[in-house]
Amino acid sequence: MNEHQQETHLPIALALLRDNELAIAALYGEYALLFPTQASFWLTLAEEEQQHATWIGDLGHALNDSLTAAGPRFSPAAIETFTRYVHEQSALARRKGLSSMAALTTSYYIETALIERRFFEQLPTRDPAVARVMTELKRSTAQHVRKVEGALHQSRPGSF
């Protein structure tokens, strides 16, 4: 893949990642509806995923000035596949076909997936503001992992 093709794919990949974050936020919103006693937990995660989508959108706007091309190791199709998985999980939640433990396990899988991390590792930037946004995304995702891990450890029959 030449440099021009990489630069062409970068805005597409960022848009897909933004859509992926919005899909995750919607999934967590479904979980909040499905598990009302845990709604606060899920709604907090959903709001934070919406913030991630905003940050990724901001990265897209900064693209022309400060981001270099993503490496050829990353495929927009990988993001699309992952987003399809998230949509399937939302459909399952709407059918009320899962337990709280299954929702937490799915969330853990989503939060620990390498899709976002690998992408951002390939975005060297000359702009300190963009670098801060990428660092904040990494930090926030790590927080989500800790929150979900804590909920998984707490989650026993009759507790959350």
Identify the role of each PLM range.
Residues M1-F160:
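Non-heme di-metal
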